[in-house]
């Protein structure tokens, strides 16, 4: 946090960051580089660190009802499945991870909060695209690893699954989260290694995903 606060005052390069924080050069670089990976820091035209886009994104969610509602549900889902859980929102033709929790041990499918993923692969993408407008579907589907028939099946069944679509060796299952009017506003997901999730992850976890999605809706 000290590095973030320092750079929020004015952009700076490594030498100045060390002077202003009192941190050793290696430590300052390691911390700043890690923050840059998570988009909390970025580089300006002069190569100096400055605040990154994730800071604004996080600030906009401080009073976000969806995140407040999901905070009471995601931990239970993680304990039930012992896998990684995420919450995604659609932004244009991408999806953004707005909340994520990891299991305490074992291999994980880590998706950082703020990560922007394509809508062309993965169960979360299928759920969000299945409930998107026709114009968005028309743009995304030509490059997707699924078809409009897949989306119709997602709407009929109420959930989606994927195996090695977004990333080799990873399987996932997702369900839509609706607001009080019934409009889909997010996708809740469970993901993990295929060796644990299996090649039909929906058969194992879809019911729990649907219950978690409904629990979030009730809290909105």
PLM regions: where:
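Conserved GNAT-family N-acetyltransferase fold
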Residues: 85, 175, 188
